[in-house]
């Protein structure tokens, strides 16, 4: 630990005595954001800082260096996968399954866009998959078992100057989201 490092409770992990990151990572490829990327968390004027937290930028939204690196890396990786990112209105929507199997994203993408990759899955197979999932039963997509209980996440981001706003964040079982 360096002299200027601040220790605190991380808002992401809930862990105490963590080194609080001073700056948050740049998030890239949010549609409509600055070409060099934008920040999810930032305070660029002293008037935006909380009273008593003016010793370091990171103290206004205390996130550990580890958690900031982790969320920045994961979010940039998800946004880099154009196949599973959609724009609705002014909101960039990114979605993923907890076990990181893209088959869940592929099925959800059909619901969002109404388009499916030609030849990948027939209409009949898709109907069977969706019927099983809606009944709470596992389904199979190209030898990947689709579990309706799999945790699934949907994040909506909107650009605002050099910052990003979280429009919504949903977490539920895949079957319930469908």
What are these regions (language model features)?
Residues 1, 17-178:
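Extended alpha-helical scaffolding segments
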Residues 4-5:
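Flanking scaffold residues of small Cys/His-coordinated metal-binding clusters
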Residues 9:
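The −1 position to Zn-ligating cysteines in a subset of zinc-ribbon hairpins
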Residues 13:
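Short Cys/His-rich metal-coordination motifs, predominantly Zn2+-binding knuckles/fingers
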């Amino acid at each position: 630990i360096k002299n200027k490092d601040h220790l605190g409770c991380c808002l992401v992990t809930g862990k105490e005595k963590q080194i609080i990151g001073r700056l948050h990572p740049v998030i890239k490829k949010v549609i409509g954001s600055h070409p060099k990327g934008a920040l999810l968390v930032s305070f660029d004027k002293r008037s935006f800082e909380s009273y008593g937290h003016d010793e370091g930028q990171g103290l206004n939204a205390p996130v550990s260096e580890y958690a900031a690196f982790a969320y920045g890396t994961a979010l940039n990786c998800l946004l880099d996968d154009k196949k599973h990112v959609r724009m609705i209105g002014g909101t960039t929507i990114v979605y993923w399954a907890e076990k990181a199997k893209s088959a869940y994203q592929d099925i959800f993408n059909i619901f969002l866009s109404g388009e499916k990759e030609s030849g990948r899955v027939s209409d009949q197979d898709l109907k069977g998959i969706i019927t099983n999932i809606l009944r709470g039963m596992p389904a199979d997509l190209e030898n990947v078992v689709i579990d309706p209980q799999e945790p699934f996440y949907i994040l909506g981001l909107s650009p605002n100057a050099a910052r990003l706003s979280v429009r919504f964040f949903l977490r539920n079982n895949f079957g319930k989201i469908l």
